């Protein structure tokens, strides 16, 4: 009798849990999007890729009169051997042709980054073998025409370092931020050909430091942002934040500060009108189970002003759920941004977005509008 009663109580608890979770899923599926897009940006938006897959991890460049877009295509956010990188090309950023698909045998592939160095297009990507993505190495391939690509080349001298996006100030020397595959340290490298890299020094150590982006200030100094995860708890961490670092040439001594406006995941930095901006992931609301980086919180792809001592949120882009990891091109007084997002009519939490369809979105922003919303 006692066992029977215990079994009944157990099943009652299971039913309550099932009903509660079902109610939560139903609410999430109906919740309308609350992105705050500044109307002064006069955004034009369209889906570059919408094919039912979980598309993610984008980058964008303009080379030889054409836009090049690359993104990951997978069943979901997590690591899988079937993931591929799709390279597309367009003259207007609206009508895209598929140029090539990249894969690595028996491995997951993600976080592609373009560089145009010495009239050659170089593509850096990260290799991953875990279901919960933890990339462990960087490889590269290159092309002289955007169509024919070399075999994958291992960066054995920098094994374990995960490359982000290189930048140059003089067109000769390129600088590459990279973070350690086990998290916690970011460094700066330099190169003249994009293939052979020399270690410049450490940017930052601590707080599960990873995705690190750089840009040059007008006076030649370098500014850097990095994703600081803190403890990396699935429900977020109040110590999660964005590192902002500034250094004079030769970029070996860094002045550090932290911004708690967001934990800037998937950052891309760019300059316009003597200001530095970032496009990255925004965590708009902090709560008990929705601290910085929580899988239960809403996410946005947003634009920020990056100052030497702080981040300033300027506007969301139309986005929701699993989103961010963008690329940018500035052309003809317009800012073109690619990024990925779940259904922008909804407002999924991050965890639901990870297993849902996500599209590659393009937006066109009049730079005059960006200037207008930027604090002076």
Residue ranges of predicted features:
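N-terminal Sec-pathway targeting helices
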Residues: 1-17
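Beta-rich carbohydrate-recognition and catalytic domains
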Residues: 22-56, 61-109, 115-266, 270-321, ...
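Active-site pocket scaffolds in enzymes
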Residues: 324-325
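Hydrophobic, well-ordered secondary-structure elements that form the walls
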Residues: 328
């Amino acid at each position: 009798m006692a066992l029977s009663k215990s079994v009944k109580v157990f099943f009652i608890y299971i039913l309550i849990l099932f009903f509660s979770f079902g109610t939560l899923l139903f609410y999430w599926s109906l919740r309308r999007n609350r992105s705050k897009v500044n109307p002064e940006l006069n955004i034009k938006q369209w889906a570059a890729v919408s094919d039912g897959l979980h598309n993610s991890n984008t980058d964008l460049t303009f080379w030889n009169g054409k836009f090049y877009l690359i993104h990951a295509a997978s069943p979901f956010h997590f690591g899988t051997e079937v993931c591929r990188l799709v390279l597309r090309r367009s003259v207007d950023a609206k009508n895209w042709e598929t140029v090539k698909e990249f894969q690595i045998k028996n491995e997951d592939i993600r976080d592609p980054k373009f560089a145009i160095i010495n009239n050659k297009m170089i593509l850096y990507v990260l290799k991953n073998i875990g279901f919960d993505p933890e990339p462990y190495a960087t490889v590269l391939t290159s092309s002289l025409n955007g169509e024919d690509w070399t075999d994958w080349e291992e960066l054995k001298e920098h094994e374990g370092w995960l490359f982000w996006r290189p930048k140059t100030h003089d067109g000769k020397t390129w600088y590459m931020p990279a973070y350690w595959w086990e998290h916690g340290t970011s460094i700066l490298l330099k190169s003249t050909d994009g293939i052979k890299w020399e270690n410049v020094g450490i940017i930052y150590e601590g707080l599960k430091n990873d995705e690190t982006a750089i840009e040059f200030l007008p006076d030649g100094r370098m500014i850097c942002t990095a994703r600081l995860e803190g403890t990396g708890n699935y429900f977020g961490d109040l110590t999660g934040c964005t590192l902002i670092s500034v250094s004079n040439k030769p970029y070996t001594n860094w002045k550090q500060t932290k911004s708690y406006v967001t934990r800037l995941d998937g950052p891309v930095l760019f300059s316009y009108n003597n200001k530095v901006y970032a496009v990255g992931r925004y965590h708009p609301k902090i709560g008990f189970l929705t601290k910085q980086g929580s899988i239960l919180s809403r996410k946005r792809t947003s634009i920020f002003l990056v100052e030497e001592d702080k981040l300033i949120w300027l506007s969301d882009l139309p986005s929701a759920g699993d989103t961010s990891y963008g690329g940018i091109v500035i052309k003809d007084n317009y800012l073109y941004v690619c990024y990925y997002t779940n259904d922008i009519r909804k407002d999924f939490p991050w965890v639901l977005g990870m297993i849902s369809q996500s599209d590659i979105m393009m937006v066109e922003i009049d730079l005059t509008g960006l200037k207008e919303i930027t604090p002076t």
